[in-house]
């Protein structure tokens, strides 16, 4: 089991090193980016945020690269937090894929492929700065509403 974990960590380290070469990194992590954006899309769809556009492809945004984007027509205080933090749902998915990889022979093609997928999901689970902005805005509104309810209830 320790060998499996070491290989998974090495793959994650490789992804981290690839960040120096932005376009190569964007290409390598594209499957994870697709999973990240799909998580926003489907949670937004279920919660009525009305996804208006879906773009999993990287594009230049000033001096940086935006790996993907989903825009919503009805992102509100009550659905902003779950939509913004939807990529966190990829963490348990990553763990399940990593666990499944331990059933394959060590360093076999299927073992490495599953570990790469697990690393993709793990890297893709990190909310972006924009995701955090939406989550904080939604949380701020919830805090104000809770405080108002508390004060008015006294």
Name what the model sees in each region.
Residues 19-76:
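Small-residue-rich helix-interface/hinge motifs
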